Amino acid sequence: MSWSFLTRLLEEINNHSTFVGKVWLTVLIIFRIVLTAVGGESIYYDEQSKFTCNTQQPGCENVCYDAFAPLSHVRFWVFQIILITTPSIMYLGFAMHRIARQPEMQIRRSEKTKSKKRAPIIHRGAMRDYEEAEDNQEEDPMICEEEEPEKDSEKGDKKKHDGRRRIKQDGLMKVYVLQLLFRSVFEVGFLMGQYILYGFEVIPFFVCSRKPCPHTVDCFVSRPTEKTIFLLIMYAVSALCLFLNLCELFHLGIGGIRDALRQKKKELQESRKKTPSAPPNYHSVLKKGRLPNGKPVFPGNGVSEGFELPTHELDRLRQHLKLAQEHLDLAFHLNPTGDNTHASRSSSPESNSIAAEQNRLNLAQEKGVGNREKSGL
């Protein structure tokens, strides 16, 4: 009997199955096809010729053997292999037909995944806070250019998987689960049929009373112990294949639930991180708000909700502002120019930084007074 055609078909299934499916295929080829073809035929080749009965009545042995084994063990197992592999072969044909019609879609999908880029990150310039503090009635730029650091191409994006995602991407998941269900049903059916036909033991002798036997006849079976061991091995192989089918169904179910939860979490994160779009190589920023008194809020100046500068920091800022103001007054008196002095003084970088520091100190003091009033109440 030639098994090459069936073996080649089953090898193709290996390319479109999960890790558990590959294990099932290995068990099927080694412990079923090879074991049945090599061991079964060598053990059962003389099952009818060595089945002898203590009678000389013509046709009695044939009738008694038919009562002993309505279906030969080897033929039963061959039929079992063919019927159990039929859903997998049908799935393979459907998969090859489906994939052959979608080569362009796969190429487009791979190109999209490679060309995906991360969304621009909101960035604020280093001198943005002090520019807002100038109060020079000039519109400050809302976008700033920043070089995007190069990252390793697709580093860490490739996730190891066992074929489940490939089956899902090709649109074969429903058909794959359906053929698993059919395989499991066939396994259960053949296990029950094998138990009904043969039980768990090959008896050494069989009592026959069928016609045309003239009386009750004792018949004897060749190598009953060896056949019993082989029968139990085939029971174990069938149970193992059924267990692998159930494990694969469980694996696909857990993987599908995990993918659904991961997709839901990803959608929630994307909905929370919706940002304004920006031109290429630019990062968009939002205009910072101001307090009711018209003073800007700086992210790094220590003045925010629920935060208050310590007393020694306030004293240090006062001393710093006092010294800076003295330097500016000295420079103002030494400058011989007239009207341009006020303009240059108000627009100098030192004046801008001092104004920012003064705003910072005022906000800290206001925050401290408000907290003390709340604590007094």
Curated annotation (Swiss-Prot):
GO CC terms: connexin complex
Residues of the signal peptide: none
Residue intervals annotated with topology Cytoplasmic: 1-18, 97-174, 250-377
Extracellular face residues: 40-75, 198-228
Pfam families found in the cross-reference section: Connexin
Keyword Transmembrane listed: yes
Composition bias type Acidic residues, residue spans: 131-151
Region (Disordered): 129-163, 265-294, 334-377
Cellular compartments annotated: Cell membrane; Cell junction, Gap junction
Keyword Aminoacyl-tRNA synthetase: no
Membrane topology of this protein: Multi-pass membrane protein
Gene3D superfamilies: Gap junction channel protein cysteine-rich domain
Extent of Polar residues compositional bias: 337-362
Keywords for this protein: Cell junction, Cell membrane, Gap junction, Membrane, Transmembrane, Transmembrane helix
GO biological process: cell communication
Entries under InterPro entries matching the protein: Connexin, Connexin_CCC, Connexin_CS, Connexin_N, Connexin_N_sf
PROSITE patterns: CONNEXINS_1, CONNEXINS_2
Ranges annotated as spanning the membrane: 19-39, 76-96, 175-197, 229-249
PANTHER family: CONNEXIN, GAP JUNCTION PROTEIN
Family: Belongs to the connexin family. Gamma-type subfamily.
Function description: One gap junction consists of a cluster of closely packed pairs of transmembrane channels, the connexons, through which materials of low MW diffuse from one cell to a neighboring cell.
Subunit structure and binding partners: A connexon is composed of a hexamer of connexins.
Official protein name in the record: Gap junction gamma-1 protein
